[in-house]
């Protein structure tokens, strides 16, 4: 409701910055978890991260995890560093609490099957089909099954 009018939207933005202030990190994104785990994926160079600033995303820390999120309407998790089985419940509990304080009712994470983050989320939450990815191979030496994505690699993030 607050996001529907200009006056209240400004108040909500100030409130959300207050809620997120202690969690925010001065970064434009996080390293690609898929490439870190040995897959091929989007190179998150400084130029790429600068390009991604067109969208209101932020990097936050909850417990030991660093999470790249977009909280425009829902919370979209773009990618995560240091999300492990040992800290996952604590991280998700903290993220759910943050969503509650922001009045957000949905948290989404999208990634390619077969990655460690996919396996971690699939252990705790039901999976559902998401965005299809199609490839046209123009002679790349990288097999398509080795290419993986997370939500932050998509332009809508």
Q: Locations of the language-model features?
A:
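Compositionally biased, low-structure terminal segments
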Residues: 3, 9, 89, 139, ...
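Soluble, non-transmembrane catalytic domains of enzymes that act on hydrophobic metabolites at membranes
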Residues: 23-42, 51, 58, 79-80, ...
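Generic structural motif recognizing short loop/turn segments at the entrances and edges of beta-strands
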Residues: 44-45, 56-58, 63-65, 72-76, ...
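C-terminal functional modules
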Residues: 108, 116-157
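Acyl-donor binding region in acyl/amide transferases
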Residues: 72-130
